[in-house]
Amino acid sequence: MARGPKKHLKRLNAPKSWMLDKLGGVFAPRPSTGPHKLRESLPLIIMLRNRLKYALTGAEVKKIVKQRLIKVDGKVRTDTNYPAGFMDVVTIEKTGEFFRLLYDVKGRFTLHRITPEEAKYKLCRVKRVQVGPKGVPFLTTHDARTIRYPDPLIKVNDTVKVDLATGKIDDYIKFDSGNVCMVTGGHNLGRVGVITSRERHPGSFDIVHVKDSQGHSFATRLNYIFVIGKSTKPYISLPRGKGIKLSVAEERDRRLQAKSQH
């Protein structure tokens, strides 16, 4: 009888967004339970060892986090498998570095360097709005935050700007046509564009049409859309490439151009 939660994760079954090589052993670190889903998170050990190269082994990562040097969303995290996810702010005070976890257009997690000013807040997608005991309204966000007494105009699928020091809502962005958004799932993962229209399909998935700054249009499901700014001005800085997916031919031309300049 298998009782209790799974404790292992095979490397071949690990999410592609972690960019682990197939031949690096049998197992991958299994993220602990936390605010993000297993397949939508990046454990601290992979962040520090495989991406930032601050450690060579898992034991070294453990020594770093146990010194309470790593903060996620302003809170010290000492678990090497802590699941940091989309939009989380990772702070390493000893080196004075701040990162925001975002996706690149190839659907991989990227640690995007940000300024200390930008590290004070994060954007959260509203997953549900409810009324709790004694009639207290509250909303739940994509990173499992519960925020009480929100502005009554905030609805599901909107985005709230949360101050990490207080956990309070500073501002919110409505889910509207004309606002800039990032795609957080599916085939178009990591692309950034402006919402052009929304098709309602009761009983199925609503489809949202998005147009990027190059004029390419694509469609995705409503629950993959994360609004990141009003009109075309995002509230966060974007990683290199600005969320514009190039076609295979465009990528090839760019590579050849870079090669010819060397």
Curated annotation (Swiss-Prot):
InterPro entries per UniProt: KOW, Rib_uL2_dom2, Ribosomal_eS4, Ribosomal_eS4_C, Ribosomal_eS4_central_region, Ribosomal_eS4_central_sf, Ribosomal_eS4_KOW, Ribosomal_eS4_N
- PROSITE patterns under this entry? RIBOSOMAL_S4E (PS00528), S4 (PS50889)
The root-end lineage is: Eukaryota, Metazoa, Ecdysozoa, Arthropoda, Chelicerata
Residues covered by the S4 RNA-binding domain: 42-105
Taxonomically, the superkingdom here is: Eukaryota
The organism named in the record is Ixodes scapularis
Question: What biological-process GO terms show up in the record?
Answer: translation
**Family that this chain belongs to:** Belongs to the eukaryotic ribosomal protein eS4 family.
Recorded GO molecular functions are:
RNA binding; rRNA binding; structural constituent of ribosome
Q: Which UniProt keywords apply?
A: Ribonucleoprotein, Ribosomal protein, RNA-binding, rRNA-binding
Q: Which residues form the signal peptide?
A: none
Where is it found, in Gene Ontology cellular component terms? Answer: cytosolic small ribosomal subunit
The protein's name in its UniProt record: Small ribosomal subunit protein eS4
